[in-house]
From Swiss-Prot:
Signal sequence residues: 1-19
Protein name as catalogued: Uncharacterized protein ZK643.6
Cysteine disulfide links: 113-149, 122-142, 129-146, 171-205, 178-198, 185-202, 208-243, 215-236, 224-240
InterPro entries noted in UniProt: ShKT_dom
Recorded superkingdom: Eukaryota
UniProt keyword annotation of Zinc-finger present: no
PROSITE patterns: SHKT
Keyword Nuclease: no
Length: 244
């Protein structure tokens, strides 16, 4: 009996591969999804996870999955971490970093603000959210679609995007096509943009750290204030809190 159940499940999955997914924008349900998810509790069953993406309307899960992960998979491979979505240890972190993968694009997470542009425009440009060319523009015009809403729920200002991986933050690329655009790192017209969105690719990271292992001993003795700024920054930038 169990074998028959899984056979039906596989056949339904094959049917979904060669069929059109439900359209969230039109709230249009497909009959096959109604058959697969006749018991709606299966919408939350991991066994049906692979079929859920094509039946978001039936499962009332459009808001949960229709967003972008904040960072491309080249920076944080959410697909590989999908098994941690509901783990006790990492669920909150996964909700923040991988909402689209985990189906956590709710109003308390990815959609805290609204798009400025028309919905159809943002949806059509969604695949460009993490591109170098359109990163800033789409962060401004389509913050909800691109999952770049600030935590306070207000629309972001004109300038958005990364900080170039400077200071104490981990140095990572924000855009997903940095390697393709690597030749722009040294081009005057693009260098500022590239260093901000692709600091790792452009070798423009400024990781804050102490150069001298004696800093923990020197700093309590007044090293930060006794010597000139350049010497302090060169030796104990992190301990003296003067990172660029």
């Amino acid at each position: 009996m169990r074998g028959i159940f899984f056979l039906i499940l596989i056949l339904n999955f094959i049917g979904l591969i060669f069929s059109v997914a439900e359209d969230c924008a039109l709230s249009k349900r497909e009959d096959r999804c109604g058959s697969i998810f006749e018991d709606l509790t299966n919408c939350y069953n991991s066994t049906f996870k692979m079929m859920l993406g094509d039946c978001l309307v039936t499962c009332n899960a459009c808001e949960s999955y229709t967003c972008n992960n904040p960072q491309p998979d080249t920076t944080l491979n959410c697909t590989a971490l999908a098994g941690e979505c509901n783990s006790a240890l990492f669920s909150e972190l996964m909700k923040e970093k991988c909402p689209a993968t985990c189906g956590k694009c709710n109003r308390k997470n990815a959609n805290l603000c609204s798009d400025k542009s028309k919905p159809d425009i943002c949806v059509n440009l969604k695949t460009l959210c993490n591109s170098v060319e359109f990163y800033d523009k789409l962060s401004e015009q389509c913050p909800s679609t691109c999952n770049r809403c600030p935590h306070n729920g207000t629309n972001p200002e004109n300038k958005t995007g990364g900080n170039g991986g400077t200071g104490t933050q981990e140095c990572t690329d924000l855009a997903n096509d940095c390697s393709y655009n690597q030749n722009r790192c040294s081009v005057k017209e693009y260098s500022s943009l590239m260093h901000r969105l692709c600091p790792k690719t452009c070798n423009a990271c400024n990781i804050c750290e102490d150069a001298n292992k004696m800093c923990p001993i020197w700093v309590p003795r007044g090293f930060c204030s006794k010597f000139d700024h350049d010497k302090v920054q060169k030796s104990c930038a992190k301990s003296c809190n003067i990172c660029k």
